[in-house]
């Protein structure tokens, strides 16, 4: 594309102290969220004739960590296609060459609210169970591609008014290790598993801890472990769940183990005390969903020792969840990710910049006619339509009572 022709395809608008330079097809931009990764706007896509969300990545080439995360997000969004993972509609840059390249814009489906807003609604069992089921389906799909999230939280899970849920991002790269230190929070880490905050090894069920924290928040209407830093968070975990057994301590690094073993010992509380019946909605007559089932699921997810924690497959088969089970959702074919060493890659900022530029150019070429070509199904088209679920009451899959603005929050 020639320089003058490319210039004519874009226009600029000031959004939340940032300049958005976007394709002319995107109109009526309105800010709806911001965070560590960038600013998000709602917009109308005149080609697709639908509302979308546009995220401008925040300083993607500021350092190697930012650049690696931007590359990882682009590659994974291009490959992953599941109804419970946010759909990629377009990627573009207003710059005309690699030398000028500095801005990346990602266009995604626009949702109605994030889970932070939904949690405050005092959900009934059907809604809570259905939201958790979709969360688990999305997580299982990521796991099938070798993607372990490690950073699930309500702000990065979004819903439609019909109760459709989607996971927004792909979490922490595996090489982004965290040490057990009194590091100030840059993003919310209340939902990260003990093995992450203690700098241990981990496996797929690291994400089930996060789901347990989110479910607990749905029940209690408050954050379970709101630590000021990792040490304070660990203290809050053991105060409620109890000090782990000596076998767990043996798995810790020596310096971490010394600290953990020197903490006061706590017996913890029973899950009946942590989550009493009074906190739960009335038992569901339609699907026979009960507080006792929900509490049992919580007790299997909120387990400090990951070797004793439930897996995503086991969670999907739990009585509180499996009323929704549909193989087309829970057993969808795994995405094919061409770069098998995605999380292990290490490059200079300039090398990352070139890799990201190539991805953006490839995606621009594939979206010339409005939508991404080469996807298993047209992302963004009929994204809400799923299989029939075993519930007929419109109140179960209808959250139209939500009085929230459209959102697609970043962390």
UniProtKB/Swiss-Prot annotation:
PTM-bearing positions, type S-nitrosocysteine: 116
Motif, TXY: chain positions: 183-185
Phosphothreonine found at: 183
One example GO MF annotation: protein serine/threonine kinase activity
Post-translational modification: Dually phosphorylated on Thr-183 and Tyr-185 by MAP2K7 and MAP2K4, which activates the enzyme. Phosphorylated by TAOK2. Phosphorylated form is more concentrated at synapses than none-phosphorylated.
Entry's localization field: Cytoplasm; Nucleus; Synapse
Effect of residue 116 to S: Abolished inhibitory effect of IFN-gamma on JNK1 activity
Reaction(s) the record says it catalyses: L-seryl-[protein] + ATP = O-phospho-L-seryl-[protein] + ADP + H(+); L-threonyl-[protein] + ATP = O-phospho-L-threonyl-[protein] + ADP + H(+)
Phosphotyrosine: modified positions: 185
Residues where ATP binds: 32-40, 55
Record-level GO cellular component terms: axon; basal dendrite; cytoplasm; cytosol; dendrite cytoplasm; mitochondrion; neuron projection; nucleoplasm
Mechanisms controlling activity: Activated by threonine and tyrosine phosphorylation by either of two dual specificity kinases, MAP2K4 and MAP2K7. Inhibited by dual specificity phosphatases, such as DUSP1. Inhibited by SERPINB3. Inhibited by IFN-gamma-induced S-nitrosylation.
Cofactor(s) recorded in Swiss-Prot or TrEMBL: Mg(2+)
Residues bearing PTM Phosphoserine: 377
Main location: cytoplasm
EC class (word): transferase
Annotated ranges, domain Protein kinase: 26-321
Subunit structure: Forms a complex with MAPK8IP1 and ARHGEF28. Found in a complex with SH3RF1, RAC1, MAP3K11/MLK3, MAP2K7/MKK7 and MAPK8IP1/JIP1. Found in a complex with SH3RF1, RAC2, MAP3K7/TAK1, MAP2K7/MKK7, MAPK8IP1/JIP1 and MAPK9/JNK2. Binds to at least four scaffolding proteins, MAPK8IP1/JIP-1, MAPK8IP2/JIP-2, MAPK8IP3/JIP-3/JSAP1 and SPAG9/MAPK8IP4/JIP-4. These proteins also bind other components of the JNK signaling pathway. Interacts with TP53, WWOX. Interacts with JAMP. Interacts with NFATC4. Interacts (phosphorylated form) with NFE2; the interaction phosphorylates NFE2 in undifferentiated cells.
Protein known as: Mitogen-activated protein kinase 8
